Swiss-Prot record:
UniProt source species: Mycobacterium tuberculosis (strain ATCC 25618 / H37Rv)
Family of the protein in this entry: Belongs to the long-chain O-acyltransferase family.
Activity at various pH: Optimum pH is 4.5.
Name of the molecule in the record: Probable diacyglycerol O-acyltransferase tgs1
GO biological process: biological process involved in interaction with host; glycerol metabolic process; glycerolipid biosynthetic process; response to hypoxia; response to nitric oxide; triglyceride biosynthetic process
Triggers of expression: A member of the dormancy regulon. Induced in response to reduced oxygen tension (hypoxia), low levels of nitric oxide (NO) and carbon monoxide (CO). It is hoped that this regulon will give insight into the latent, or dormant phase of infection. Also induced when grown at pH 5.0 for 3 weeks.
Pathway linked to the protein: Glycerolipid metabolism; triacylglycerol biosynthesis
Phenotype upon gene inactivation: No detectable TG under hypoxic growth conditions, or when grown at pH 5.0. However, about 30% of normal levels of TG accumulated when grown in the presence of NO but there was virtually no C(26:0) TG produced.
Free-text function comment from the UniProt entry: Catalyzes the terminal and only committed step in triacylglycerol synthesis by using diacylglycerol and fatty acyl CoA as substrates. Required for storage lipid synthesis.
Active site: 137 (proton acceptor)
Length: 463
């Protein structure tokens, strides 16, 4: 597809509406040394980028949004304009690295060129170096971006991700439309009932999403943002998370969100704010990407808006409430409504949807406090130019009054959390990261001392 979908174009519109927003997603790879020289790196990168034409294309915009932006080949494409090199004062530590990442992610990508950058970062302690890869969100969602980035490694990792992407289920209504008259009336009745049930769920989901967005949240973590950022990160062993999953029959995503909930609860308390039921309404993206669409560079997501239980003091109760609310949200109609809305929007004339999206972006959104996105990453360690990738940190942007975002990515034997925050209002981004690690450790300790017998639950990294 050469034209942006309504969702893809919405990420551009969010930047147009708020000059403080930079909607790039990123991945920070920390790599064993020594760093290659620039010529060798450019040569290797050029070879690996060749299969994906999107890296050599820029957007052609239509005046007054008369048509959807279109990807076109950039006749002036120069790899050297997309690959930059920078060094920390030796020996650079983690805090200095994260400060640099925050600064680089705050800078907008140039729309006159292909919408991506690679930063080679030298000067890390122990002869390590790093690569920050930035892609505009209109170009890819988290899953597509992760597969693109893994493709830059020394070997194809397409079969090595932490979990299979759920195959998007085909609507039963489609089979009714294609099938014409059915011989078996009971089958037609079953299909019609399923369609009506889907419509009812989608309508309920629409009301839930509207209520979530329009109801003001009691939190200082929602409001206008500046053009400066802070970045911090947490890292926990996947084996520890899986132990909690097995003990309490929950998913990896449940444990991760419960840890995030505890960390936000502590931050709110230290700010002198009372954690309430609606203090942490969270946008949780849900992938609708099928396995056959992994190579597509676009956005294929729906959403859920659960209230994470920051008002709950007990860690185990908090975990169980997170599990319960996510289970209900998955079974409810929020995802269905999101899918239906995007399908309808993509069939309407683009000027109409662009105007509607622009109007919605300008409304003061006070109901949602943060975004928490979870992407399955490579199960096996990657190598870049013969050097091991030691750590892989995700970065997701902030926008629409959300002053923090949390991105989660599994890599090899660990689960990584990347926190991007507004510089002026969220000085405690590092505390959020440490709080996540402490919360996971607390759940692990509880799982070791509690004697409960439960069946083994499925472990999944995709909501």
């Amino acid at each position: 597809m050469n034209h942006l979908t309504t969702l893809d174009a919405g990420f551009l519109k969010a930047e147009d509406v708020d000059r403080h927003v930079s909607l790039a997603i990123g991945a920070l790879a920390v790599i064993e040394g020594p760093a290659p020289d620039q010529e060798a790196f450019l040569s290797s990168l050029a070879q690996r980028l060749r299969p994906c034409t999107r890296f050599g294309q820029r957007l052609r915009l239509r005046p007054f949004d008369l048509g959807a932006p279109k990807w076109v080949d950039d006749p002036d494409f120069d790899l050297g304009r997309h690959v930059w090199r920078i060094a920390l004062p030796r020996p650079g530590n983690e805090d200095q690295l994260f400060e640099l990442i925050a600064d680089l992610m705050a800078r907008r990508l140039d729309r006159g060129r292909p919408l991506w950058e690679v930063w080679v970062i030298e000067g890390l302690a122990d002869s390590k170096w790093a690569i920050l890869t930035k892609l505009h969100h209109c170009m890819a969602d988290g899953i597509a971006a992760t597969h693109l980035l893994a493709g830059l490694s020394d070997e194809s990792m397409s079969d090595s991700f932490a979990s299979n992407i759920h195959t998007t289920m085909q609507s039963q209504s489609a089979s009714v439309r294609r099938g014409g008259f059915r011989v078996n009336p009971s089958e037609a009745l079953t299909a019609s009932t399923a369609v009506m049930a889907g419509i009812v769920r989608a309508a309920k989901g629409a009301s839930e999403i509207a209520a979530g967005v329009l109801s003001p949240a009691a939190s200082s973590l929602n409001g206008p943002i500046s053009d400066l950022r802070r970045y911090s990160a947490a890292k926990v062993p996947l084996a520890d998370v899986e132990q909690v999953c097995r003990k309490f029959d929950v998913t990896i995503n449940d444990v991760a969100l419960a840890a995030i909930t505890e960390s936000y609860r502590n931050v709110l308390i230290q700010r002198g704010e009372r954690p309430r039921f609606d203090s942490l309404r969270t946008l949780v993206p849900v992938s609708t990407r099928s396995n056959s669409a992994l190579s597509k560079t676009d956005n294929r997501v729906s959403l859920m808006l659960p209230n994470l239980p920051v008002d709950q003091e007990n860690p185990l109760q908090r975990l169980r409430i997170v599990h319960s609310r996510l289970t209900r949200a998955k079974a409810g109609g929020q995802r269905q409504f999101g899918n239906t809305l995007m399908a309808i929007a993509n069939r309407l004339p683009f000027p109409m949807t662009a105007w509607a999206v622009g109007l919605l972006m300008r409304l003061p959104q006070r109901g949602v406090v943060t975004v928490a996105t979870n992407v399955p990453g490579p199960r096996r360690p990657l190598q870049i130019m013969g050097r091991r990738v030691l750590d892989l940190y995700p970065v997701s942007p902030i926008a629409m009054q959300l002053r923090t975002s949390v991105a989660m990515l599994s890599y090899a034997d660990d689960l990584y959390f990347g926190i991007l925050a507004d510089y002026d209002v969220v000085a405690d981004a590092g505390q959020l990261a440490r709080g996540i690690e402490d919360a996971v450790a607390r759940l692990v300790a509880i799982s070791k001392r509690r004697k409960v017998t439960r069946r083994r639950g499925a472990l999944s990294l995709v909501v």
